[in-house]
Swiss-Prot record:
The gene is murE. One of its GO terms (molecular function) is ATP binding. A motif (Meso-diaminopimelate recognition motif) lies at residues 423-426. This is UDP-N-acetylmuramoyl-L-alanyl-D-glutamate--2,6-diaminopimelate ligase. GO terms for biological process: cell division; cell wall organization; peptidoglycan biosynthetic process; regulation of cell shape. Carboxylation is probably crucial for Mg(2+) binding and, consequently, for the gamma-phosphate positioning of ATP. It comes from the Bacteria. It comes from Buchnera aphidicola subsp. Baizongia pistaciae (strain Bp). Meso-2,6-diaminopimelate binds at residues 399, 423-426, 474, 478. Catalyzes the addition of meso-diaminopimelic acid to the nucleotide precursor UDP-N-acetylmuramoyl-L-alanyl-D-glutamate (UMAG) in the biosynthesis of bacterial cell-wall peptidoglycan. GO terms for cellular component: cytoplasm.
Length: 508
């Protein structure tokens, strides 16, 4: 077992920023009040709502926080006492959000003897992360993963709140995994995580880019801001090995500007491969897609081979090639990787098939943005080209509203039947969201509105022919529905299995 020693002396830990008169030994650091334990340093990263901030402080104190650092933008307050609650001092800390990663780095002081992989992009982060993990596991190597589907090893994952967790949670995860002698980690990197400093001070060895298309414009405001957030991970972080999908138009423009780094490109297009001329590369020169598998013929700077995979869709070809490049760069033998590729399983809620004899095939997918839905439906039209496609989807409330009409347009053009339903409406009225989606649709005769998601799925299952394809998009692996900001248990997977197994299904 790896021996790790934390820097628990608080005065010493914070000496670069503030001088404390409090001589404390801490047992941990957290920015989430729910995860605070006795003896912890709690870091209050200020929220817009001051009542929420105070509520988190009280919660942290009840959980045993020993001392609290309180974020401030006023430099003159740095290191001064804000107040004391129940014998717990609350100290102002200038730009705590920005400095917290550095404090955590000093607290854990990891030796640089492990491999940390960061995977970013609009779509495909979870799938690529899990392919890397599964593939390595098939060759008897365990990889710690952290992202949308959870954190841990292989199928033994614990729930995460965000695609990219807080800086405190990431460091804590690495610490516990290193104690178990895990030496390689793959972490999903969101644009929010980059902008909010959550991944700063982490010793990334490899950065992977899946693709860049419009997303999170409610947060970033413009596409340029979103692109620049992703770009920062490759240009501003000290990461030497960069693995890039050269089929992506935006990513392709970055490659020559990064020629001072160890850039590895993957591509499925001959013209892209010929125009880039990279030092390290993988080029899929022939792709055969079937209804239940994909064959990928590839050449590379490591050698050539044929990958057989049960994952379908061109976007999954990209994800597989990115994972392949990662493992080849980490010196996994190409022959072994080719041999075991066929055993990689479908990732939960990502192009996941549920099929029972004499019933329509149902596909669950997390596609929740314009490009994701387009790729999903175009793949199904190509592979199941003579079958009728039903598309059930909605758009999240209190999120990017600009994508709604585009998603409506894509669904009606690429599906035979469309059912608009709820997908985490949050604080928005469900019918208002559906109206926004409908504004992009021209042929409303093929569209049905059933806000209750369970009812929508039931309607499709009961009315689709056994040869039809039903696509349930947007929620994927999620096991909840958010309505009026309350979480209700809901699983597409569970509902579909129940419906397909029962002829006469009654709603609860």
């Amino acid at each position: 077992m790896t021996i790790l020693i934390k820097n628990n002396n608080l005065q010493q830990l914070l000496s670069s920023w503030i001088k404390l008169s409090y001589s404390y030994t801490i047992s941990g650091i957290q920015s989430d009040s729910r995860l605070v334990k006795p003896g912890y340093l709690f870091c209050v990263l200020k929220k817009k709502n001051i009542n929420e901030t105070n509520k988190h402080m009280i919660h942290a104190i009840k959980n045993g926080a020993k001392i609290i650092l309180y974020d401030t933008k006023q430099k003159f307050k740095n290191g001064t006492l804000k107040k004391i609650i129940n014998h717990v001092p609350i100290i102002y800390f200038f730009k705590l959000s920005k400095n917290l990663p550095q404090i955590l780095k000093k607290y854990y002081h990891f030796e640089n003897n492990f491999t940390l992989i960061g995977i970013t992009g609009t779509n495909g982060k979870s799938t690529t992360t899990h392919i890397v993990s599964q593939w390595a596991n098939l060759l008897n190597v365990k990889i710690g993963i952290m992202g949308t589907l959870g954190h841990g090893i292989n199928n033994n994952l614990k729930k995460t709140d965000n695609t990219t967790e807080s800086s405190a949670n990431i460091h804590q995860f690495l610490y516990h995994m290193l104690k178990q002698n895990i030496k390689t980690f793959a972490i999903e990197i969101s644009s929010h995580g980059i902008v909010q400093h959550r991944i700063e001070q982490l010793p990334f060895k490899i950065a992977i880019l899946t693709n860049i298309t419009p997303e999170h414009l409610d947060y970033h405001r413009t596409m340029d801001n979103y692109i620049n957030a992703k770009k920062a991970f490759f240009f501003k972080y000290n990461i030497n090995t960069l693995i890039i999908n050269a089929d992506d138009l935006i990513a392709k423009t970055w490659i020559k500007k990064l020629n001072h780094k160890n850039v590895i490109t993957i591509t499925t297009k001959d013209q892209n491969f010929n125009s880039i001329s990279p030092k390290k590369w993988i080029h899929a020169n022939k792709i055969i897609q079937k209804q239940n598998c994909t064959n990928i013929h590839f050449n590379s700077s490591w050698g050539h081979g044929i990958l057989n995979s049960t994952l379908i869709g061109h976007f999954n070809v990209i994800n597989i090639l990115l994972a392949l490049a990662t493992l080849l760069e980490l010196n996994y033998p190409i022959t072994d990787l080719v041999k075991v590729c066929k055993y990689i399983k479908t990732i939960s809620g990502r192009m996941e098939h549920i099929h029972i004899v004499n019933k329509p095939k149902v596909i669950i997918d997390y596609a929740h943005n314009t490009n994701g839905l387009k790729n999903l439906l175009s793949t199904l039209k190509e592979i199941f080209n003579k079958k009728k496609i039903w598309c059930i989807f909605g758009c999240g409330g209190d999120r990017d509203k600009t994508k709604r009409p585009y998603m409506g347009s894509i669904a009606e053009k690429m599906s035979d039947q469309v059912i608009l339903t709820n997908d985490n409406p949050r604080n928005e009225h469900p019918l208002k969201i559906i109206k926004n989606i409908l504004s992009g649709c021209k042929f409303k005769n093929k569209i049905r509105i059933i806000p209750n998601r369970e009812h929508a799925i039931k309607f499709a299952v009961n009315n689709a022919d056994k040869e039809d394809i039903i696509v349930v998009a947007g929620k994927g692996h999620e096991k909840y529905q958010i309505i009026n900001n309350k979480y209700y248990h809901f699983s597409d997977h569970k509902i579909i299995k129940k419906l397909l197994n029962k002829k006469n299904y009654d709603f609860n």
